[in-house]
Amino acid sequence: FWLSETPDVPSKGWDAVLPRICSWGHFKCKDTGFEFLFFNLHMDHIGKKARVESAFLVQDKMKELGKGKELPAILTGDFNVDQTHQSYDAFVSKGVLCDSYEKAGFRYAINGTFNNFDPNSFTESRIDHIFVSPSFQVKRYGVLTDTYRSIVGKGEKKQANDCPEEIDIKTYQARTPSDH
């Protein structure tokens, strides 16, 4: 669905500079019957209202797409804001979602996820988030900055503006590598 006032129609939302979407899936474990929803998005980098309204839209869609079952959900993506911004609060303030960083029993995160294309930078700013329903137990959380130094070929270094994150949720393991 589109992160806009008209989520069923390709569109830019609110004050967004670019059209943005949220992809989702409904999953069911064959062995246990456990069901959950998984969402991934890339929020606008400029539109403040778009980010806040998108946060509320995604949470409304979680309820709608669960078809009355109140299924647990995982939401990943590049949110283009860190843990100090209003749109981050919009995700965690309703009690529908928790930040896996905050919920984790163990954190391997010596750096945040935003590096502005500088592999030597240090930041506590986390713009890539993994949010989970309160029913999930998050055992470990990691920001894997070692990927900055991966050899791509002939001595070239891999460049990225965000760090991959990895969490282990109960018996499920999720890895969200950043695409940029």
Question: Model regions: which residues?
Answer:
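Generic anion/oxyanion-binding catalytic loop in active/binding sites
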Residues: 14, 47, 173
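Metal-dependent phosphoester-hydrolase catalytic domains
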Residues: 62-73, 81-180
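Short glycine/proline-rich turn/loop motifs
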Residues: 6, 40, 166-168
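Structured beta-strand-rich core segments of catalytic domains in phosphoester-bond hydrolases
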Residues: 1-35, 140-144
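Active-site-proximal beta-strand/loop segments in catalytic clefts of secreted hydrolases
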Residues: 1, 40-44, 76-80, 102-104
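A short local loop/turn or secondary-structure capping micro-motif enriched for an aromatic residue
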Residues: 6, 46-48, 147-151
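His/acidic metal-ligating clusters that form di-metal
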Residues: 19-39, 49-91
